[in-house]
Amino acid sequence: MRPRSGGRPGATGRRRRRLRRRPRGLRCSRLPPPPPLPLLLGLLLAAAGPGAARAKETAFVEVVLFESSPSGDYTTYTTGLTGRFSRAGATLSAEGEIVQMHPLGLCNNNDEEDLYEYGWVGVVKLEQPELDPKPCLTVLGKAKRAVQRGATAVIFDVSENPEAIDQLNQGSEDPLKRPVVYVKGADAIKLMNIVNKQKVARARIQHRPPRQPTEYFDMGIFLAFFVVVSLVCLILLVKIKLKQRRSQNSMNRLAVQALEKMETRKFNSKSKGRREGSCGALDTLSSSSTSDCAICLEKYIDGEELRVIPCTHRFHRKCVDPWLLQHHTCPHCRHNIIEQKGNPSAVCVETSNLSRGRQQRVTLPVHYPGRVHRTNAIPAYPTRTSMDSHGNPVTLLTMDRHGEQSLYSPQTPAYIRSYPPLHLDHSLAAHRCGLEHRAYSPAHPFRRPKLSGRSFSKAACFSQYETMYQHYYFQGLSYPEQEGQSPPSLAPRGPARAFPPSGSGSLLFPTVVHVAPPSHLESGSTSSFSCYHGHRSVCSGYLADCPGSDSSSSSSSGQCHCSSSDSVVDCTEVSNQGVYGSCSTFRSSLSSDYDPFIYRSRSPCRASEAGGSGSSGRGPALCFEGSPPPEELPAVHSHGAGRGEPWPGPASPSGDQVSTCSLEMNYSSNSSLEHRGPNSSTSEVGLEASPGAAPDLRRTWKGGHELPSCACCCEPQPSPAGPSAGAAGSSTLFLGPHLYEGSGPAGGEPQSGSSQGLYGLHPDHLPRTDGVKYEGLPCCFYEEKQVARGGGGGSGCYTEDYSVSVQYTLTEEPPPGCYPGARDLSQRIPIIPEDVDCDLGLPSDCQGTHSLGSWGGTRGPDTPRPHRGLGATREEERALCCQARALLRPGCPPEEAGAVRANFPSALQDTQESSTTATEAAGPRSHSADSSSPGA
């Protein structure tokens, strides 16, 4: 037997072999010399570059375990792991069955080994490098070998060999098309436990970008902002809705209260004497023109309960109450029942004032065509609408201004004193006139014209007593005043005293004046200016270029001018072209040099005394009509003359006053420019008459613009000779002073004073050189000076543009030349030649003191006119007045009128040649009068 020691030498031999292997292994595992420092820095930078960021991308590995049960069912368990994508492979998702591979198994290059089917995920656990000092393949080579065998992805456990990460990253230049993932730490332990214990497991690799910490921050801010804004809007809407509901409830309560305060009446068609809205109405309403309900369009039945709104409109109570509760306004006029201010008795007071105001009527003087230049501002006053006793709407003014109280008496109403007066020019002197005129008979049936016209869509009617001042203020005229009793020396001589003079300098005004829309020029249309008065209740728009713009209820008709041409057409008596105070400003004919006549209808001018009164020639008319309430025609001192005589008071029983208007238009259709001074109103007016009633009288007066003339006998005053004014032309239209008729004797003692003509024209514009046509004896003289159009006047204006200023005559003392009973304001001076329904008469004595010469001679165009004495002039003018009286008297026999007409043309021819001498005589006197006048 061998001893045991014999075995020990063998054990010693094995140790020796191990020792020998270690040095050999150590010799094989010697590392190459370390690379230089710049190379290491480059590698670090490369690792810190995009590759490092790419290597940090996370790979989510989801391992699904399948456990089979005895019944054949499978139970799945999912385990989530986290790894990193290596730069050696692609960064994408992959899925497949897990197959564990040994590192040495990947080194086998035997082609006989079975290849796995495509779609598996290989899991390789790397060992320590010391255990494999001489590996057959690198880690990257092993990954390539696995992909070649059909692996969709390769997962390396680098927990024991961290250097493998760097080896994998070295293959970034030629990466694989399949993902290469490495895991370590706890995730690697979980993965290896699953691989070692489970036979069937499936891995799903997903690539997810790293979540940003502010990924949903913007969305959160937006949602928060949206929620806040929504809440704010919701709160505001709720508040607004609640406020509207409270306001609606309040308005409904106010409407109910207003409805409770409104009166209800029972309709009674049998009661004819009681009017709607009258103060005496108790519990019934009378029938009127509106006997049907405007809502249901059914007629009122006796005993039906009607609701009367504060605007005096009435409806069925059952029809209007729901509307009023919902809309709070009148269905007819939109009157707000909640905002109604004032007491219920205001309508009654207004109705009573209106009924009293209707008793006083006035016809405005003639308006001459031209362009108006207003010298003061025109503010607008608020108005409100009410109803008169006839059911017609009237507009009332609301005045808050306070004018110069010193100009009005204590008895003057407050609404009159609230208007500032307009200071007028006192530039015209007076003259003597001994003519007597007849009083005007108040008996005249007024008719209401139908509304017609295309100049304005809705008539602006003002028929209340107070509304006349809007007309005056809009036109820039003076304002009225009511005075006390007149002096006893001016007692009325006629049936009644219409204008008792006053010595306190009061102002003139009409009682009722309507205001129409402002004038404007349109092609083929007319101006819609109309001065309408109390005896009418509807404003009229009219066409001045047609044979009658509206239909009328009147059966009588006459002839009137409806165009600027010489044609004469039939017009009804109450045509809108001839309403009292209406005026036409339309320039229809392009060929005619002058505008048409002012359209005025007939008005009765009946004499109250058979033989002692007369009517003046044709010209501007002052027509007064009305009823007994007396008013005063005050007088204002004029600086144009140094002496005066008492004026007689008119014998008309009317309580009307004189008024004037200013209107605005283009004199010619082709005018476009105009030069005006700051405070001047200039005009040139051509009057054109129809040749149907009298011979075509043509007379051109030459002279200074301050030469006055008589409104009755149509004679200008004499003027001293003087040099001509040169190229600066002046033209003046004169109307005599206001006329009175009193009870004093015909030869009463004169009083100092002077008067101013009613119309004054300023010489700022170049006048026209055409003559002025007159029909009969005009009451207004138109004086013009023929000058060169390119003269040195310096006005720089166009000759087609003219202006006119229609003003009041304000005098403090009666003018000279008119004895008591000499004139009558109620006399109407016809403008239209065919409107001769007045009993015209001329005085037996005409005491004009003029130096324009006789009317009876003829002279050549170059024959000088001698200056005649005062006595000879008076005799010739007296004869001239008698001839004119015979010519204009409607009842004149044909043979007598023919005899007069036979002698009359010679006088007219004579007067046409009398321009130069009168102009030279009026020059110095005009300048002296201007220097002595203090101005307006």
From Swiss-Prot:
Its EC number is 2.3.2.27. InterPro entries: Znf_RING, Znf_RING/FYVE/PHD, ZNRF-3_ecto, ZNRF3_Arkadia_E3_ligases, ZNRF3_Znf_RING. It is a single-pass type I membrane protein. It is found in: Cell membrane. A zinc finger (RING-type) spans 293-334. Keywords: Cell membrane, Developmental protein, Membrane, Metal-binding, Signal, Transferase, Transmembrane, Transmembrane helix, Ubl conjugation pathway, Wnt signaling pathway, Zinc, Zinc-finger. One of its GO terms (biological process) is negative regulation of non-canonical Wnt signaling pathway. Residues 241-936 are cytoplasmic. It comes from the Eukaryota. Residues 13-27 have a biased composition (Basic residues). Residues 56-219 are extracellular. Residues 1-55 form the signal peptide. GO terms for cellular component: plasma membrane. The chain crosses the membrane at residues 220-240. Pathway: Protein modification; protein ubiquitination. Negatively regulated by R-spondin proteins such as RSPO1: interaction with RSPO1 induces the indirect association between ZNRF3 and LGR4, promoting membrane clearance of ZNRF3. Residues 1-31, 608-693, 739-758, 849-875, 892-936 are annotated as: Disordered. Residues 913-922 have a biased composition (Low complexity). Residues 654-684 have a biased composition (Polar residues). Belongs to the ZNRF3 family. PANTHER family: RING ZINC FINGER. Interacts with LRP6, FZD4, FZD5, FZD6 and FZD8. Interacts with RSPO1; interaction promotes indirect interaction with LGR4 and membrane clearance of ZNRF3. Also interacts with RSPO2. Interacts with LMBR1L. This is E3 ubiquitin-protein ligase ZNRF3. The lineage of its organism: Eukaryota, Metazoa, Chordata, Craniata, Vertebrata.
